[in-house]
Each structure stands twice: as structure tokens, then as C-alpha cells.
Amino acid sequence: MEWETIIGLEVHVQLATNTKIFSGSSTAFGAEPNTQACAIDLAMPGTLPTPNAEAFRFATMFGLAVNAEIGKRSVFERKNYFYPDLPKGYQTTQLAEPIVGPGYVDIQLADGSEKRVRIHHAHLEEDAGKSLHEDFHGMSGIDLNRAGTPLIEVVTEPDMRSAEEAVAFARKLHSIVTSLGICDGEMSQGSMRFDVNISVRLKGDEKLGTRTETKNLNSFRFMERCIEQEVERQIEVIEDGGKIIQETRLYDGETHKARSMRSKEEANDYRYFPCPDLLPVMLDDDFIDAARAAMPELPDARQLRFEESYGLSPYDAGIISADAATADFFEAVAAKCSDAKLAANWVMGEISARLNAEEIRITAAKVSAEQLAGLIARIKDQTISNKIAKQVFDAMWNGEGDADTIIEAKGLKQVSDSGALEKMVDDVMNANPAQVENYRKADPAKQPKMLGFFVGQVMKASKGQANPQQLNDILKKKLEN
């Protein structure tokens, strides 16, 4: 039997407003528990919410970025359920008339193909608080600092057919909201959380299978593993004669396993009704036009510009343009060193490797764009080789100064003096007469590989500082005489 996977996503995007969606409380991350929740956030008697205009502006920008219809009239409703970190006993959200209507996002896959993922809608809502379980033996604590933080929840159509497609969409969405500046994208801090709806059906069937929802995934790696495991589990259950239960599941990032939390609720279970404390919000054309005018360059447009202006390949341009901060860093390096391709190679290579190893963002890189451009300039003018450049980069990352300072202090300048190189080549050839004879008698097709021995010996003698191109030219000339 051949199975088909059906995936839809619900993505919670925390908006980067300074205050909450219905109150003036701060949204800053990392404050002491319960120091940023006011009477409005807790729905104390006598309080009334006031909508945050910035949240509406951010949601409008998002809608425009994903080719969606903007709801000029949007209505808030109460979603009623009990949970300890939901102090009101309901969540203020949108259902019937959301601010963002149908739209779409185009994603690129590893094989070079493109796919369109439809967005059903996106709505504004308030976040809940946070339950804390680790610091309280036998009990749980509640931190309400997050309660009332503005979110947009993005709901897709079930258009994705694999973990690869779901992760590609999630990455693209992350790229869009961070480029817009409406979300900081810090997934480890809960700024973006993904709920994954998964079902399977036999290839060719039209009817959707019973779905499960796995909640609050906060990394692309977790999402990929979770989807692959859940698809495998569902297929195994069905092939063994069982039935999939519609349920909500929770993925544990430490054990990399998902477990059942509860049966999956339907909208009716939440008893939605219009919020009596909030009037419908009406957006006029001027508001929408102002939001459009404030939008920065989006990832797709940036990728195309990088291909056309800098001559980057679609792959390189796509990688660099996906993150706004990385794109800015690259452009700063390229402008200072006048070699976009070398700049791209170093940003995607050494810089990216260090950022991943230290789990930091490029805004915290220990080598500035100006310093990296200085290093590339020394490669271009042949002061140092690519191999030596990596040593210099290591020293720069460790705070030992700029490229020129390190090259001078460590004596790393490339040996480009032809007389000095010829002497080193002569010394190596005199010390290895048998290898010289073998080279001269060898089939020409084998000589390039044999040349590597002599290159290695001279590089060893020069402590890696011989100019590779000049060295190759001198060796070939002398060995062929």
C-alpha cells in the first residue's frame, strides 16, 4: 500500500509590540515572573480592554506580505476554556471575521521545485500565560507575564505532503515575519510556535484521514522529527487494523517522542461568542496603504536582487536572503570588499559555522562585516592564501584584532617572491631525486596527482605561506626541464 501524508499548520507568531494587545503592560522577555501583568490582563472586575493599534498594523503588513485579503472589519470573540495559565477563563481571539483572509506563500524545495501553500486565514489574539513545572516540587507555578501578548495565528490549508514541505513553509514564514520586523523570530523564547495537524490516506483517495494535532513545536528540527514519527505511527496503527484517534499530542524535545495529551476539541467545544467589551475594528484604505508603505524588502524580492545585482546563484541568494540580518551583513561585507561571491562564500561558510557552533545569531557575530571585508581584501591581493585566511579568521573570532594586525603579528604573509619560491622548490627537488625521476617518466595523465607531493613538501617548508598559484607554476616548469 502506498500512503499519502496530509499536513496543515497553525503558527503562533508573537508580535514585536512594546505593549500587550489590550493593555499597556510591557511585553519585554525575561522579566521576573508576574511583574508584567496588570488588572486588564487578568480581567479583574471593572477593567476594559483597549486594542493596540500597532498589533493591527503588524497584522496588516503580514497579510499584505502573504498575498492575502485584509479584513477591513474584524471582530473579537471569546474562546472559552479553563486552563491554569488563562486567568480570564477565556481567550480573546478572532474566528468569524479575522483581520487576514485567504492568501498564499510559495516555497522552494531541495530538488529546485516550487510549491504554493495556501493560507486559510490569520487572526489576532492574546497569548496565555506560562505554566512552570520544574521549580516546584509536586506543584506547578504560573507566570502571567506572557498573558495578553499579541499574537497572529496563521492557519494554512492542508497543502503540505511531507516533513520537508512543512519545514520549508515554516522557514519561509519565519523569514517573512523577521524581515518585516513584526516578530523577533526567537523560537527558543516562544516567539514562534507551530501546531502540526497530520493525517494519512491511501494514495488516490479523496477523503481525508483522521488527523492528530501536535502542539507547541519551537524548532524546525523538532518539527521534522515529529512529523516523520507521527506519519510512521499512524501508518503502523492503520496497517495493524487499528483506528487513528482524533487527539492533541505533545512532543518532548528531550526524549524526541510525542505523547497523547487529550482528545481533540472542535470549535463548538469552546463556545465562541462576540466579545462584549470590544467593538468591531474597522480599517480604512489609508491605514492599509500606510502599512504597505512601511513594509521593507521581502525575502523573495531580496533573493532576486541578490541574483541580479551580485551574480549569486539562486541557492546562495536564497540562503543569504532568508534572514534579514544575514542579508544586511552580507551586503555590508560585499560593499567594502567589492567581491560579492567571496563575501557570500565566507558568510555561508566560516561565519555560519561559528554561529551554529555557538548557537548565536549573526547580530552577535564576533567578527564584524568590516573585519571580514578586510580579511577578504588580503586574500584578493594575495597577501595570504585561503588556507592561511582561515587561521587569521580564527584569531579574529577570538578577539586578537583585525586581519592586518594578526597577519603582521604572526608573520603570516604569503611568500610570493619568485626567487624565494624557486629556492624552496630546488631544495625539495634535490632532497627527493627519485620522486623527480618518477614524475618525469610518468604518464602525463598521472602527473597532476604526483605534483601534489612536491606542493606538500614546499608548503611544509614554507609553513603554509607559499603562494599556491606561483608555486604550481614554478614546480611544473622545473619538473618538466
Curated annotation (Swiss-Prot):
Main enzyme class: ligase
Biological-process GO terms, alphabetical: glutaminyl-tRNAGln biosynthesis via transamidation; translation
Domain of life according to the entry: Bacteria
PROSITE patterns on file: GATB
Pfam families in alphabetical order: GatB_N, GatB_Yqey
Catalytic activity, as annotated: L-glutamyl-tRNA(Gln) + L-glutamine + ATP + H2O = L-glutaminyl-tRNA(Gln) + L-glutamate + ADP + phosphate + H(+); L-aspartyl-tRNA(Asn) + L-glutamine + ATP + H2O = L-asparaginyl-tRNA(Asn) + L-glutamate + ADP + phosphate + 2 H(+)
Sample GO molecular function, one term: asparaginyl-tRNA synthase (glutamine-hydrolyzing) activity
InterPro entries assigned: Asn/Gln-tRNA_amidoTrfase_suB/E, Asn/Gln-tRNA_Trfase_suB/E_cat, Asn/Gln_amidotransferase, Asn/Gln_tRNA_amidoTrase-B-like, GatB, GatB_C_1, GatB_Yqey_C_2, Gln-tRNA_amidoTrfase_suB_CS
This protein's UniProt keywords: ATP-binding, Ligase, Nucleotide-binding, Protein biosynthesis
EC numbers on record: 6.3.5.-
SMART domains, per the entry: GatB_Yqey
Oligomeric form and interacting partners: Heterotrimer of A, B and C subunits.
Assigned protein family: Belongs to the GatB/GatE family. GatB subfamily.
Function, in words: Allows the formation of correctly charged Asn-tRNA(Asn) or Gln-tRNA(Gln) through the transamidation of misacylated Asp-tRNA(Asn) or Glu-tRNA(Gln) in organisms which lack either or both of asparaginyl-tRNA or glutaminyl-tRNA synthetases. The reaction takes place in the presence of glutamine and ATP through an activated phospho-Asp-tRNA(Asn) or phospho-Glu-tRNA(Gln).
Name of the protein described by the UniProt record: Aspartyl/glutamyl-tRNA(Asn/Gln) amidotransferase subunit B
Source organism of this protein record: Teredinibacter turnerae (strain ATCC 39867 / T7901)
UniProt gene name: gatB
